[in-house]
From Swiss-Prot:
This is UPF0502 protein GSU0233. InterPro entries: DUF480, WH-like_DNA-bd_sf, WH_DNA-bd_sf. It comes from the Bacteria. It comes from Geobacter sulfurreducens (strain ATCC 51573 / DSM 12127 / PCA). Belongs to the UPF0502 family. Pfam families: DUF480 (PF04337).
Amino acid sequence: MEILLNDVEVRVLGCLIEKELATPEYYPLTLNSLTTACNQKSNRDPVMALEESEVVRALDGLKMKHVAIQAADSGRVPRYRHILSERLRFSPAELAILAELLLRGPQTLGELRTRAERMHPFADLAAVEQVLGELAERTPPLVMRLPRQPGRKESRFAHLLAGEPDLSAEERTAPPEGARLQVMAENERIAALELEVATLRAEVGELRQVMEEFRSQFE
């Protein structure tokens, strides 16, 4: 099954997969939680500032492409989940790698192993490479190895759910220096804490809404 997504659909699908694997206790996601996940600053490249209406349109697109649905048991507050596993029979390892590529774009084997750890453990780089090979061998292929950039020692891999990446743009992107990488790592840790607080606040707000609706039945 060929899938072609736009940039917002890529972000929404990546977030649905990530949260299923990393925080299953909060999955499926409400629209509020999904929008927060799409806009978080950690583990995202590029960082986005999407409105809920944009996320709704992306969800509609994913539904039409048969990769996401509204959960049947979502209750009073609608919740959403992806259905890639049902349609394409992905393993957890394949989903973790695919989610990381959807959320952060092209990455090396080492980057994928480290960053996907929160979703699925990989014993070594060979395990990551094996999963990438399996995704590349599907019909149609879901990932590809990019030509190595000048100044980089390792090749990177990209997903193909939005079509082939613009290689001319890739060539213009210089690798970040060591100090910049350190700052980026620190920013990610801070952003991760901010996201956790925002997620908890969203869940509390939703619980309050449900309680108020329940209480109103007896007034």
